């Protein structure tokens, strides 16, 4: 962490996620105070494994938004069995379930990151998209 400029934390919508966040924030403060990297910042927090049907997920998001309103991403990654399935098929979530809620959410999180950093990806053209090696989604 001491070598990083910014920290982006994926945070599970669970109680232990909040405990882990508190520990990471303390470590970031210690790195600053020790002079190892005085400019290190907590760039953002992306809530993951969100299930809007549960009070716990909603409470965790509310707690994070209370203490870290500027860092909390608007995009929330939903709990999805497809995320766990993808690696067992040797695929990314974008290849395994391209139109699923999780794929869309991760794409939105990437867009939000780029927008926060005022970085805009060039439009996909034949010149800057790698050729597909084993399926049509390989360039995603």
Language-model features, listed with the residues they occupy:
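C-terminal boundary of histidine-terminating zinc-finger modules
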Residues: 87-108
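A general structural signal for short secondary-structure boundary/capping elements
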Residues: 35-36, 90-94, 120-124
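Catalytic histidine-centered segment of alpha/beta-hydrolase-like enzymes
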Residues: 83-85
